[in-house]
Amino acid sequence: MAAPSPVRVKLLFDYPPPAIPESCMFWLLLDAKRCRVVTDLASIIRHKYMDGQGGGISLYVEDCLLPPGESILVIRDNDSIRVKWDGAAIERNQEAETCNDGAQNKSKKRHWKKSEDECDSGHKRKKQKSSSTQVDLKSGKDGGIRDKRKPSPPMECNASDPEELRESGRKTHKGKRTKKKSEAPIENPPDKHSRKCPPQASNKALKLSWKRQTSSSDSSDTSSCSDQPTPTTQQKPQSSAKRQNQAATRESVTHSVSPKAVNGISSTKNKKADAPISSSDMDTAVGGNETLICPVPPEDLSTHIQQHSQSPTSDSAESIELVIKKSNASLSSLTDNRVAGVSDKLSPNVSGRGRGRGEDFSWRGQRGRWFRGQGNNSNRGRGRGDSSNVFYKYNTEKEKQQQLEESATNVSIIIQNPQETMKRDYSSLPLLAAAPQVGKLIAFKLLEVSENYTPEVSEYKEGKILSFDPVTKQIEMEIISQQTMRKPGKFDVVYQSEDGEDIVEYAVPQESKVMLNWNTLIEPRLLMEKESQVQC
């Protein structure tokens, strides 16, 4: 049978393939040796024309489907095969979707730009409106200020409205009362202020009273303007009279207070400049009933008294004497307290109180705290607990006497090491190839479990053969050599008896009689009778 030759096939695509998009019809030279089934041809077409993309491929010849498992011999030379690829439709759908998405994004961008433009135009309109309103407000304010500066036209009162007349009468009464209250402190004689107040305080009080008078007069003027037309020129003589009264009070204050007293007052004022002065205090100082007394040092007060003793006024001298007595009493109390504090600091053995409250009662501990490094623990109170440390003092003389009286005895203790047992040399003994007779002594080694539960070869042990089974090679042996007692390990169980003794149950028992296999013995050697007797 001749070998299959290559076949020329025409391929017809519904859409141009992605690898060669120039056409939909192609010639393909099919090698029948490489293909056995129709599926192989489909894979070749996918690799060449679809760039290995997914999607189902169906092949038709004369509108008849070629089954994927059919032999490749179905296809003849110059057959036209229609290729139907499902991936082309999927690609076209994806392209359409991307186009739609791009159009939507463009429309969104356009809408966004439009909204931004609208917002900008809205902001511009708002700014224009706000600027116009600001201009209107400024113009309104300017007009209001000009209107306030202009004298208000007189209001015409109608006699037919009795309620308006009553209100205007009430306002006039209120204005008169405020005038009387403001003028009351000025009517007081200037001597009282000059005797007991410093010039700065009086100046401040006068300024406050002047402000209140002006404010009250303004309010009264505005209220009266609503009732009757009053010209503004009438306030000038009143203000000039008030200024003359103020100047007179200032001159009287400056004449009455000496320069030395003023210097003393200024020094004390610098020390106590932080003390706030309220408006109510200033009103009471100016009122006349309450007076301000300024502390002055005694030297300045003596000069002040000498100067004022020459003046003919007796009232001023009496008031100055009272002030001096009070200031001297306060100064004496201050000096007594300072001297007492200094004496307390200088005297360390004073049994006085500390900073505690109350007096020293017999049933209470002394309160307060003493200075650091001074005083005893008795000066501390019992409120927080006495933190006194107790130290025991030992009499060294008694200890020395006891050491001298004691009898010294020399005792010598000899410490001897235990005699070392000479280890036996088992290497010179003859090795055993088979089990010896019953009753013989042998030396052997065993594979045992150590304290760490690891297998180790033990040292030579001596044992006496009690019985031997030649079939099973089991030896019953009595171990003669002394066995070293090992400590119980983690797998050993320790019991406690009624007497309190510990009973150890070893995982690997240590018994004198043992059943062993002859093959388990390592290097068994025969012990001579002489050596066994010497050992006994």
Curated annotation (Swiss-Prot):
Biased segments, Basic residues type: 171-180
Bias type Low complexity, positions: 213-238, 371-380
Tissue localization of expression: Expressed in both oocytes and somatic cells.
Domain Tudor: 425-523
Region (2 X 6 AA repeats of R-G-R-G-R-G): 353-385
Record-level GO cellular component terms: Cajal body; sphere organelle
Protein name: Coilin
